[in-house]
Amino acid sequence: MNGREVLTLRDGTSVTLRRVRARDAAALQRLVRRSSDRSVELRFFGPLKELSNEMAERFSTVDGKDRHALVAMDPEDPEEIVGVVRYERKVGADGAEYAALIEDRFQHRGIGIGLTKKLIEAARENGVRYLYALVLRDNAEMLGLLRSLDLPERLRWQDGAECVEIDLS
């Protein structure tokens, strides 16, 4: 995805999608602060009160090929991020790790699936053959999102979580 795109949510709200930028580090920190403890725990596999400056900089620095991330902007405050999806691929690997965080008030409205479909397009363009996500078993929302992609998937247990592998070929 180059530039910006508009995604219409299930309730008719329009949100802008775009690639993450280096200057988004502070907005990513605010997204984590606004998210519930449960949402943060499901994303980071444990409590996290604050996204460190180092983590925020890492998450907002992408190369568009092996590290790629897309964000959804708050329709009422276009400086604020309300959702982020990302993949990260090790050099030379066929697959990339996928992760997402959607602000609670925007969950179940279509941002997660909309961002993920755009991320999959970018992953395919960059030669990523599969995405994998480590998902806690009680994260029904993420498991449902991944299954709703209607792509071939494989499940296995890894490091205390479900590893959901989505085939992009």
Name these PLM-found stretches.
Residues 1-169:
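Long, contiguous binding/interaction regions
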